[in-house]
Amino acid sequence: MAAREESTQSANRVLRISQLDALELNKALEQLVWSQFTQCFHGFKPGLLARFEPEVKAFLWLFLWRFTIYSKNATVGQSVLNIQYKNDSSPNPVYQPPSKNQKLLYAVCTIGGRWLEERCYDLFRNRHLASFGKAKQCMNFVVGLLKLGELMNFLIFLQKGKFATLTERLLGIHSVFCKPQSMREVGFEYMNRELLWHGFAEFLVFLLPLINIQKLKAKLSSWCIPLTSTAGSDSTLGSSGKECALCGEWPTMPHTIGCEHVFCYYCVKSSFLFDMYFTCPKCGTEVHSVQPLKSGIEMSEVNAL
């Protein structure tokens, strides 16, 4: 029976990363609340909140504490991750929420401690210089001890996975799941699908620059736009000059490349600049030189139309 309870507790134990994520979410929420609160005072006199910043922060954190830990036994970050605080000092194995005294002490240690850390030097500034120096040394010594205690607590937390902060260890509260967690089955179908799609996308990014889109487009257009003259007829430059061999329209500034077909100047020049091995899509003739069509032949064709 005891072995079964131990296995159940180990299966429902909150992961270390989940507890640390909850702390990071709490810090992010506090920064967001404070930034949104300061936005309300942009139109006021500069430095208005500077004098009362520790007190205003303490009031905001107290407001958050009232509607999170005091009422729901969990911080905002813990609620997101489906965990909450449990009274570790209770001998009953059934879930026991933190007592009211523990919640109040939690507020004193977290909210009051941060307020005292920001206000301690201001409280002793008006004192005598010697007493201020002694108070400063004492405060530095206490802060150093707390930092050392937090470091030792964090090392123990990494080893045992319990009490993520020094405050939790001193008050005897630790994180547990809100509901019993069942064993999760990890499936790799989604990951495999994402890896395949990413690999296919990288392959396309590597392959597409190697494809001559302009040449492929010209080849397809040559299949779609048939020759106006038949194979048996005498194909002359005038009979084939009624349309551009690339775009199929009446040639604008007609030019030739050494074969019997006519091109728009823009079509043939852009294709030749894009591909130095450009060939005529109709007959496959290589570009020797781009020459304008003789005006006499062009005018005769216009008159024939």
Swiss-Prot record:
Zn(2+) 1 binds at C244, C247, C264, C267. Forms intramolecular and intermolecular disulfide bonds in response to reactive oxygen species (ROS), promoting higher stability. It comes from Rattus norvegicus. This is Peroxisome biogenesis factor 2. SMART domains: RING (SM00184). Pathway: Protein modification; protein ubiquitination. The chain crosses the membrane at residues 16-42, 49-74, 99-125, 134-160, 188-211. Its EC number is 2.3.2.27, 2.3.2.36.
